[in-house]
Amino acid sequence: MIKKSKTAEVIISALPYIRKFRDKIFVIKYGGAAQTDDNLKLNFARDIVLLHMVGIKIIIIHGGGKKINQTLDLLGVKSEFADGLRITDKKSIEIVEMVLSGAVNKQITALLNQNGAKAIGICGKDANLLEAEVLSGGKYGFVGEIKNVNVNFLKDLLTNDYIPVIAPIAANEKNETFNINADLCASKIASALKADKIVFLSDIDGVLDKNGELISKLNPNLIENLKKDGTISGGMIPKIDACVECIENGVKNAHIINGKIPHSILLELFTDNGIGSMVKEVF
């Protein structure tokens, strides 16, 4: 009886957030362990369906680095990285596109639909969703950045109750294919839509201080200071920079959460304290 009562309390405590978030646009960057562990994948799909059922408009951008590495290794193609980005030559980009758009994207979409969603799997090439240009003058090969987002296409999908699942592959005006960093892709899409929230699923709890403790609330000024003193470093820098870019471009809140925790999205969004790090301009 106590357990049932506790469950009821949890549901009731979520009601204010459900009311607040109805009809809002949330962009979810899906990657890391949450994308490879079968139980976590199922939890993620069910959480997304629940968010959609309570009236939140969801857009998912996914990565697929582990699957890309496995496929490149299988085909005997060497992987190289610089500045945290995959150096992508002409042969590799064909494989990356095949894996992200043809395999990973459709697997995510199918799992969502099996659990009651109305998801549609697309990439940046579809309906000219994303227009790309080469990053850093071609330093990383066929790695691009987003020049333009077809906002009207995304809004049409959301209006018709779809959940877009987007593979970060796009073309430029010459119809050359580019691999886009999924964090940056999610950031550009959220910024273009002026989304209410963007959520990055990571493999750690969020931004940690020098004692390894979670910093639950950050603003751009604090982030700049933490980068200067080395508290924020390494692989967290691209994610936190993406958060700041979103906030500076009209996204109200950015979150970094641990996707290895079951139902982490619900725990972050529907509880008072959350479980990760939230970035906003003013608290």
Swiss-Prot record:
Keywords: Amino-acid biosynthesis, Arginine biosynthesis, ATP-binding, Cytoplasm, Kinase, Nucleotide-binding, Transferase. It catalyses: N-acetyl-L-glutamate + ATP = N-acetyl-L-glutamyl 5-phosphate + ADP. NCBIfam families: argB. The lineage of its organism: Bacteria, Pseudomonadati, Campylobacterota, Epsilonproteobacteria, Campylobacterales. One of its GO terms (biological process) is L-arginine biosynthetic process. Catalyzes the ATP-dependent phosphorylation of N-acetyl-L-glutamate. HAMAP family: ArgB. Transmembrane segments: none annotated. The keyword Translocase does not apply. One of its GO terms (molecular function) is acetylglutamate kinase activity. Its EC number is 2.7.2.8. The record marks K29, K239 as: Transition state stabilizer. Substrate binds at G64, G65, R86, N179. It is an enzyme of class 2 (transferase). Pathway: Amino-acid biosynthesis; L-arginine biosynthesis; N(2)-acetyl-L-ornithine from L-glutamate: step 2/4. This is Acetylglutamate kinase. It is found in: Cytoplasm. One of its GO terms (cellular component) is cytoplasm.
